[in-house]
Structure formats: structure tokens, C-alpha cells
A protein has these predicted regions:
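Secondary-structure end/capping motifs
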Residues: 26-104
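Short secondary-structure transition/capping segments
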Residues: 14-16, 77-79, 116-118
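Residue-level "edge-of-site" marker
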Residues: 7, 70, 109
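Conserved C-terminal helix/tail region of periplasmic/extracytoplasmic solute-binding proteins
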Residues: 97-127
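Phosphate-binding core of ATP-grasp and ATP-grasp-like enzymes
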Residues: 10
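Ligand-binding "clamshell"
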Residues: 1-6
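A bilobed periplasmic-binding-protein/Venus flytrap-type ligand-binding module shared by bacterial periplasmic
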Residues: 13-29
Length: 127
């Protein structure tokens, strides 16, 4: 059985990027440019349904009906602003703590850096 955690009211990070802090420090401009491109793609995804479904259908190799269903489901749960939330990271850590014992004592906030999302929000990429 496949469950949609957001549909069950369970906080879950639906989108976002994971980058080591050391990489971010030395390659911040690359990460910012990548996130700008991601923001542009997200805008197309949310604002141009037909174009998005056509592209997804082509590259996923699924029927249009299946692709549209997946599109509609993801759109319900995905945030237009990919700002990570402490609650969603906490849920992830809870989910992996059995196989990753360090997760049980990890501080969810230590995994979050919103500086790039904040910058792109000021630039108008996210609302």
C-alpha cells in the first residue's frame, strides 16, 4: 500500500535540496543559480498545467491519465515556497531513527538553512 503522508496530516518535506554545509560555503553562487532554475521550473509546474503534463508524459513514458493523476496529487502537497520546516525534518528523523540511531538525538533545526530561500523570496522567485 502506498500512502501519502501529507494527505494523512503527517508533516513531510515534499521538496527541497540537500547540500553539505561545506559545499554551500565554498560554492554558494552555484547553489543559488541551481535554486533559481528550480524556482523557474516550479513556477511552470504550478502555473502551466498542460505544458507540465505534456512534458512529464513524454519523459515518464506513462499515459496522460496516469501523469495527470500524479501531477494533481503532487500539486496538492507540494509547497510553492520550498522553505524547509522543522516539523517535516523531525518527521524524517523519526522515520529513520531505527536504522540510523544518530537521528534519534539529532536537532532538526541543524539541518535547515533558509538563507537561499530567503534571498530568492526577496528577489520575487517565491511568494
Amino acid at each position: 500500500m502506498l500512502l501519502a503522508l501529507p494527505g494523512l496530516g503527517i508533516p513531510w518535506q515534499q521538496n527541497g535540496e540537500l547540500v553539505p554545509q561545506s559545499y554551500l560555503k565554498t560554492n554558494r553562487d552555484n547553489v543559488v543559480r541551481f535554486m533559481r532554475a528550480t524556482a523557474e521550473a516550479m513556477k511552470i509546474y504550478f502555473d502551466q498545467k498542460e505544458k507540465t503534463i505534456d512534458c512529464m508524459t513524454e519523459y515518464l513514458g506513462r499515459s496522460r491519465e496516469e501523469t495527470e493523476y500524479a501531477y494533481n496529487q503532487y500539486k496538492r502537497w507540494a509547497d510553492r515556497n520550498p522553505r524547509p520546516q522543522v516539523e517535516t525534518i523531525r518527521t524524517t528523523l523519526e522515520a529513520i531513527k531505527k536504522n540510523t540511531p544518530k537521528a534519534a538525538t539529532a536537532n532538526p533545526a541543524s539541518f535547515i538553512d533558509t538563507s537561499i530561500v530567503d534571498q530568492l523570496t526577496k528577489e520575487g522567485y517565491f511568494k
